[in-house]
A protein has these predicted regions:
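ATP-binding pocket architecture of kinase catalytic cores
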Residues: 43-139
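ATP-binding glycine-rich phosphate-binding loop
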Residues: 20-42
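Generic alpha-helical secondary structure signal
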Residues: 98-101, 149, 173
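A cross-family kinase active-site recognition segment
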Residues: 112-170, 186-190
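Active-site acidic catalytic loop and adjacent metal/ATP-binding pocket
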Residues: 35-51, 84, 179-190
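Juxta-kinase regulatory segment immediately upstream of eukaryotic protein kinase catalytic domains
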Residues: 1-24
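Short Pro/Gly-enriched beta-strand edge/turn motifs at strand-loop
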Residues: 18-25, 174-184
C-alpha cells in the first residue's frame, strides 16, 4: 500500500512554492503535523514561508477554503491566528497533484502550566473563537461527533493490525468505556 505523501519530496515542495511565483533559496525544513505535511521554505531575500500540503483524498477544496475563510474571519475579529497568504486572489494552490497553502512564519510558545493569567487568556480566546464560529455553520467540514471520530475510529483500529494482540482486549475495554462517557457528555452538550 502506498502512502499518500510518498511523492512529496523536498524538490517537489520547492517546485510547488516556486510555481506560484516565490523564489526559494532551496532550504526546506519539515515541521510537526499529524494529518497533513507542513514545511518551512526559505524564500530568496525574504522571510521563510510555511507551506501546508493537504492530505490527498482527505479534504475537499470546499472544506479547505471554508477553513481558510474561517481563519480570515477570526483574524478580522482580532483572534491571534495565522491566516493563509492570499496570492493572486487565491489561498489554495495545486502542484503535481498536491493541494497546498502558504502562510507567514509566526513563532509561538506553549502556555506555562499553572499560570492562571495565561489560562484565563486562553479561555478568552477560546470563547472568541467559538463566538465567531457560531455566526454561521460549516457546510463542508465533517462535524466532530462521537460516531465518526469515536466509534468509527475505534472500529478501524480494532479491525486493522495497529494494536498488538496482547493489548487488544484492554484497549477495546478502555476505549468503549471512554466512548460511553463521551456520549453522555454529548447528550448535554451536542
Amino acid at each position: 500500500m502506498s502512502h499518500p505523501f510518498e511523492t512529496l519530496t523536498p524538490d517537489l515542495v520547492l517546485d510547488a512554492v516556486e510555481s506560484i511565483g516565490f523564489l526559494s533559496d532551496a532550504r526546506v525544513l519539515a515541521l510537526n503535523s499529524y494529518e497533513n505535511r507542513v514545511y518551512q521554505v526559505g524564500i530568496d531575500e525574504s522571510e521563510p514561508l510555511i507551506a501546508k500540503f493537504y492530505r490527498p483524498q482527505r479534504w475537499t477544496n470546499e472544506a479547505i477554503l471554508e477553513e481558510h475563510r474561517f481563519t480570515f474571519e477570526l483574524a478580522e475579529c482580532d483572534v491571534p491566528v495565522v491566516a493563509p497568504i492570499i496570492h493572486d486572489g487565491a489561498s489554495l494552490f495545486e502542484h503535481a497533484g498536491f493541494r497546498f497553502a502558504l502562510f507567514p512564519r509566526r513563532g509561538g510558545r506553549a502556555p506555562e502550566p499553572g499560570n492562571l493569567d495565561q489560562l484565563y487568556r486562553l479561555g478568552q480566546l477560546l470563547g472568541r473563537l467559538h463566538a465567531v464560529g457560531a455566526t454561521r455553520p460549516f457546510e463542508h467540514r465533517e462535524a466532530l461527533g462521537v460516531k465518526n471520530f469515536g466509534h468509527d475510529s475505534l472500529a478501524t483500529l480494532l479491525q486493522g493490525n495497529f494494536i498488538p494482540k496482547s493489548l487488544l482486549p484492554a484497549y477495546e475495554s478502555v476505549a468503549r468505556d471512554l466512548l460511553k462517557r463521551v456520549e453522555e457528555v454529548y447528550l448535554f452538550h451536542p
